[in-house]
């Protein structure tokens, strides 16, 4: 049967949705969609359940261009329908933060052997200036062009008239001396070594055992029974997951098609193709059918929107652009299962970290960008919580000159380390039940730890890393906020640590050594008891107890 005659069964997928044309335009927005499984019949496109007029949609092969003349409406899910089939729904943001990714001929190798953007940089303009006006002035002065923006942060992306890295670096230095420029952000990328971790052979693991260490099933049972019984008016929560996409052919995502009913867990994402992709695993911990935490809350669930987005593929800058849009679209919890190390960062054994590294030039720009993001978050959206992975360099998570973004000290950033089941046959509440994941970054900037190893039902081997511990914590936080939306980020952190199980030995409160994982449990987190056996140990997520404290917090003034 020819795909050209009509769409093959269940192959309609939106693989890409990005701003195109003039991304700075406030009068009209153009969006380019790359779609598979279209066939020859004209598709119907829906935004928020409303059919878009046919004249707003142009097709060229597998690419569709959507033009919105009055882009002032609310952000909403978008999907296609053809012959009774519905595609995966993708989140269409009406916010204005969009950056451009470099093409294959717009990158080069720098002296550190890292791939760096050649002619695309971003400038962070001092807040007392009109950002767009100043960016255009600078662009005119240097023969550049403004092509992207993260307007709330006063960040503007420029395309430079350069042909090699010598010319680029010279222009970056000159731009950095402009009075109005706070920082110039250079984008880099580098390969991540194979699986997250250090390539050791993994012991045979059982998914249920790993998550039992955080009382995953106990938490599901508690929510399903306690919430209806106590008549708590739980509220829907929107979660943002900074990832490329999700494999909608994977068993846990096959049911997420087209419209999603109010009160359910909904997933909005580009189709990622690979069932073993990073985004599929991370999003699956939130929302995979029969496996994900939020999807398993059942009839008691108020409904969770899980929005998976990374803007364009323009690296860290795109991650921040997507995060800004999502926060403006009402996201309360952001899942950042990503992070970077500076070239030269060393692990706890003194060896150089060789995964996810960036040059000093790139790191200094990223640090300024992230600082601006968290300042904006505190000023405009103080109720939003960012949950970030500590990293897998077996290094220190809180050294700000070597690790981003987990080194930032702000109440709105929760940092998550990783543990795995130990060989000891002891109860779940025994500190020896788990051990520190050998590759997990450590130190007192890590707030809590969670299971780092994941083994989906159809996987031949486990996937491990703090990337997979992070969504366990983020999903717990989302459920806590559904129970008590008034919780502040500082209160959420306090409840997570008060409720935590422990792992490891008691610390001596001196400099972190290789065995410590998180900030030590303090007497104030154990009711002021100086003889509590948990004191000085690292914190391990207890999902059920965290939900219980969230319920109690509704009636307590702290």
Name each region found by the language model.
Residues 148-165, 188, 192:
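Surface-exposed aromatic
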Residues 111, 222-318, 329-332, 343, ...:
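Subtilisin-like serine protease catalytic core
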Residues 5-42, 85-113:
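Beta-strand/beta-sandwich contexts
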Residues 24-86:
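Immunoglobulin-like IPT/TIG beta-sandwich domains and homologous Ig-like subdomains
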Residues 243-245, 251, 403-482, 486:
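Extracellular S/T/G-rich loop segment that most often corresponds to the catalytic His/Ser-adjacent loop
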Residues 331-338, 412-415, 484-558:
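C-terminal subdomain of the subtilisin-like protease fold in secreted/lumenal serine endopeptidases
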């Amino acid at each position: 049967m020819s795909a050209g005659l009509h769409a093959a069964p269940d192959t309609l997928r939106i693989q890409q949705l990005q701003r195109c044309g003039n991304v700075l335009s406030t009068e009209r927005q153009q969006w380019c969609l790359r779609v598979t499984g279209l066939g020859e019949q004209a598709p119907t496109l829906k935004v928020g359940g409303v059919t878009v007029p046919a004249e707003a949609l142009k097709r060229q092969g597998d690419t569709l261009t959507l033009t919105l003349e009055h882009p002032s409406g609310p952000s909403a899910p978008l999907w296609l329908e053809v012959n009774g089939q519905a595609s995966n729904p993708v989140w269409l943001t009406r916010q204005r933060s969009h950056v451009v990714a470099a093409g294959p001929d717009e990158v080069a190798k720098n002296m550190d052997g890292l791939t760096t953007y050649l002619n695309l940089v971003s400038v962070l303009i001092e807040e007392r200036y009109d950002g767009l006006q100043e960016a255009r002035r600078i662009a005119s002065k240097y023969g550049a062009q403004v092509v992207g923006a993260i307007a709330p942060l006063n960040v503007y992306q420029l395309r430079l008239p350069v042909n090699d890295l010598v010319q680029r670096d010279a222009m970056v230095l000159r731009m950095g001396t402009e009075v109005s420029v706070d920082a110039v952000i250079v984008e880099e990328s580098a390969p991540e070594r194979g699986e997250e971790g250090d390539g050791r052979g993994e012991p045979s693991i059982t998914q249920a055992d790993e998550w039992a260490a955080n009382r995953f099933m106990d938490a599901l049972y508690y929510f399903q029974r306690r919430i209806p019984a106590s008549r708590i008016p739980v509220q829907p929560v929107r979660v943002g997951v900074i990832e490329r996409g999700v494999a909608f052919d994977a068993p846990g995502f096959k049911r997420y098609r087209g419209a999603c009913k109010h009160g359910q867990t909904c997933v909005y994402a580009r189709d990622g193709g690979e069932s073993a992709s990073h985004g599929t695993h991370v999003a699956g911990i939130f929302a995979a059918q029969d496996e994900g935490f939020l999807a398993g809350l059942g009839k008691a669930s108020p409904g969770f929107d899980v929005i998976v987005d990374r803007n364009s593929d323009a690296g860290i800058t795109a991650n921040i652009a997507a995060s800004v849009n999502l926060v403006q679209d009402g996201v309360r919890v952001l899942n950042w299962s990503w992070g970077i190390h500076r070239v030269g960062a060393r692990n706890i054994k003194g060896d150089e970290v060789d995964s996810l590294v960036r040059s000093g030039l790139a790191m200094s720009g990223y640090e300024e960008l992230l600082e601006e993001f968290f300042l904006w978050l505190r000023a405009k959206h103080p109720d939003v919580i960012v949950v970030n992975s500590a990293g897998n360099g077996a290094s220190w998570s809180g050294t700000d000159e070597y690790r981003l973004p987990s080194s930032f000290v702000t109440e709105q950033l929760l940092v998550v380390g990783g543990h795995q089941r130990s060989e000891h046959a002891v109860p779940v509440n025994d500190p020896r039940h788990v051990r520190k994941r050998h590759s997990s970054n450590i130190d007192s900037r890590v707030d809590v730890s969670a299971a780092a190893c994941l083994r989906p039902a159809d996987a031949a081997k486990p996937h491990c890393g703090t990337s997979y511990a992070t969504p366990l914590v983020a999903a717990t936080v989302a459920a806590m906020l559904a129970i008590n939306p008034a919780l502040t980020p500082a209160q959420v952190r306090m409840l997570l640590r008060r409720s935590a199980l422990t792992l490891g030995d008691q610390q001596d409160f001196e400099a972190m050594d290789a065995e410590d994982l998180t900030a030590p449990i303090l007497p104030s987190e154990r009711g002021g008891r100086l003889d509590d056996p948990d004191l000085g140990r690292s914190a391990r997520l207890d999902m059920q107890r965290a939900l219980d404290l969230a319920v109690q917090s509704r009636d307590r003034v702290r």
